[in-house]
Amino acid sequence: MISSLQSVQNTAARIVTVTKKFDHITPVLIQLHWLPVHFRILFEVLLLVYKALNGMAPLYIMELLSYCTCSRSLCSTDQKLLAVPKSRLKTYGDRAFSVAAPKLWNELTLDFRCLDKIGLFKKHLKTNLFKKAFNV
C-alpha cells in the first residue's frame, strides 16, 4: 500500500516539476521539500501524539496514551516517556496506534518531547525526518 502511495507522490512530483519519467525522483522530492510517504506517516503519527499529550486531540486518542510510571528512583519522570503496551501479535498488534505511537515518541530526543509550541514541534520534526529520509 505504501509503495502505491509513493508512486502517486512521485508522479505528482514529476507533474509539478515537469520532470521526465525516467529521471531519478529523490532530487525532485528534495527540491519540493516533500517527505516520502513512509516518513510523512511517521510525521502525522508523531504530530497526533503531540496533540494528544497537549490536550489538542480527541479524547478517544488521548485515552490511548499514558506516561511511563516507574517505581524505581532511577527512572526520571521528566523524560516524558510514554508507556508502551505489550501486543500479542507482531504483525498487526505492533501497528496499532496505541503500540506504535509510544514507541515512535520514545525514540525522539528529549528536546523534541519538551517543545511547548506546536509550530516549533512541526518545524523541527519535519526537518529531522527530512534529514533522515534523504541523508542531508
Question: What is the meaning of each model-derived region?
Answer:
Residues 1-136:
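Hydrophobic/basic alpha-helical segments
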